[in-house]
Amino acid sequence: MAPPAGGAAAAASDLGSAAVLLAVHAAVRPLGAGPDAEAQLRRLQLSADPERPGRFRLELLGAGPGAVNLEWPLESVSYTIRGPTQHELQPPPGGPGTLSLHFLNPQEAQRWAVLVRGATVEGQNGSKSNSPPALGPEACPVSLPSPPEASTLKGPPPEADLPRSPGNLTEREELAGSLARAIAGGDEKGAAQVAAVLAQHRVALSVQLQEACFPPGPIRLQVTLEDAASAASAASSAHVALQVHPHCTVAALQEQVFSELGFPPAVQRWVIGRCLCVPERSLASYGVRQDGDPAFLYLLSAPREAPATGPSPQHPQKMDGELGRLFPPSLGLPPGPQPAASSLPSPLQPSWSCPSCTFINAPDRPGCEMCSTQRPCTWDPLAAAST
């Protein structure tokens, strides 16, 4: 079968004999393509031509085994620098057309541009040495003549020379780091291109703010605890101070309370800044920023009918009346009144439970004291008092 016009199929054995001077990764897409065109991560490679001493060739390698790769003599392409990370590559006629190259790292882009310029100058001088050209201190635009030579198609390189794919763990980490740097540096276009590559390969990411974005810690969080079992008595509340970091999540705070005070996360309901907290959000997102910021912890009661197997040993259920037994007197928790055996029980004050955070509210409150949820329309104070 005849090779493509203006070129020839390269033998796989020739690849191993070429001395690779530098290989870099860049997001490549046709220059004339629309803004919705997908950029493909490709490897640019500059190597010495073993058949032409003192000459070099530029290779554009695809990802994955069996991919068709392109290479051109360096003197046959036109290479232009448009910005710190934006370059253009114009192959000779018969090639894929002008390509836009976006590098993930400005230093890597500068090093590549300097090497291409040095190799171009050395090739034009007709040097007989295959030694790498000297790297200059800075990159300058490179624009080379374009003689009518077509690109050469060649088979896939050896397995050891394949470019890293985003399916590789190392490549994923590098791309994730590049995405973080692009966002931190305000490079919207670079961040979009790296994100597109990650999305094409469906890489699972967890995007979180760094601790430097949050207020400094630790700080003392003033926590008021309420026990649902005895919400009408003075012994139903206690006040404690917890050392926390604003960047910690509510879930981490729940585990801290379980470790220090013994209440499992399943019975904890946190209200901070008039909001019922969700485990995934940070404390700072609810306004926790400095010493003395308040928080409210509402402790649910365990079900009346416990299972036959008993509570889990890892997360034991909080039983009614446990708040007074778990807190030492140093926390300022007043002892509950001990009614005489002959005294009649006092009538319960009518109250209503918030449907959002389950806080027990006074009967005359139109909304929840903790989270401002409106009182249920179906609540009847007379019926509540009679029960």
Swiss-Prot record:
Residues 219-288 form the Ubiquitin-like domain. Residues 1-180 are annotated as: Self-association. SMART domains: ZnF_RBZ. Changing residue 357 to S: Abolishes binding to ubiquitin without affecting interaction with RNF31. GO terms for cellular component: cytosol; LUBAC complex; synapse. Residues 339-349 have a biased composition (Low complexity). A zinc finger (RanBP2-type) spans 348-377. It comes from the Eukaryota. GO terms for molecular function: polyubiquitin modification-dependent protein binding; protein-macromolecule adaptor activity; ubiquitin binding; ubiquitin-protein transferase activity; zinc ion binding. One of its GO terms (biological process) is mitochondrion organization. InterPro entries: LUBAC_E3_Ligases, PH-like_dom_sf, Sharpin_PH, Ubiquitin-like_domsf, Znf_RanBP2, Znf_RanBP2_sf. Monomer and homodimer. Component of the LUBAC complex (linear ubiquitin chain assembly complex) which consists of SHARPIN, RBCK1 and RNF31. LUBAC has a MW of approximately 600 kDa suggesting a heteromultimeric assembly of its subunits. Associates with the TNF-R1 signaling complex (TNF-RSC) in a stimulation-dependent manner. Interacts with EYA1, EYA2, SHANK1 and SHANK3 (via ANK repeats). This is Sharpin. It comes from Homo sapiens.
